[in-house]
């Protein structure tokens, strides 16, 4: 199994609910290590650049508005198959379809306010991590 890194964002809805610690506990219980982390209030430009892949999608404007609506917690997770493991923890994008016990089933409000973001592939993870963390700020442990 490969040790990977993935980007995770705890979105404004989950930050506002004060469940950061509960989400971190799930990461750690699944064998994922937080190797970089910071809280930020994204600017419109940062959110638009981060989600640029969705620029032509009908939900893009609402997604950007949501992501700049409050602080987010951004972290790099590291571990065996970190990308797939994190995606399992998150659950389906639509919390109504997410399996019981997943982050989205337990903490998300809607398909828009869905608590967390996670990289979907190794190539995406590299690009997403670089958006928020220079390599000097990431510390394997």
UniProtKB/Swiss-Prot annotation:
It catalyses: a 2'-deoxyribonucleoside 5'-diphosphate + ATP = a 2'-deoxyribonucleoside 5'-triphosphate + ADP; a ribonucleoside 5'-diphosphate + ATP = a ribonucleoside 5'-triphosphate + ADP. InterPro entries: NDK-like_dom (IPR034907), NDK-like_dom_sf (IPR036850), Nucleoside_diP_kinase (IPR001564), Nucleoside_diP_kinase_AS (IPR023005). Its EC number is 2.7.4.6. The keyword Signal does not apply. Gene3D superfamilies: Nucleoside diphosphate kinase-like domain (3.30.70.141). CDD domains: NDPk_I. Keywords: ATP-binding, Cytoplasm, Kinase, Magnesium, Metal-binding, Nucleotide metabolism, Nucleotide-binding, Phosphoprotein, Transferase. It comes from the Bacteria. ATP binds at residues 11, 59, 87, 93, 104, 114. It holds the Pfam family NDK. GO terms for biological process: CTP biosynthetic process; GTP biosynthetic process; UTP biosynthetic process. It is found in: Cytoplasm. It is an enzyme of class 2 (transferase). The active site is at 117 (pros-phosphohistidine intermediate). Belongs to the NDK family. Homotetramer. This is Nucleoside diphosphate kinase. It comes from Nitrosomonas europaea (strain ATCC 19718 / CIP 103999 / KCTC 2705 / NBRC 14298).
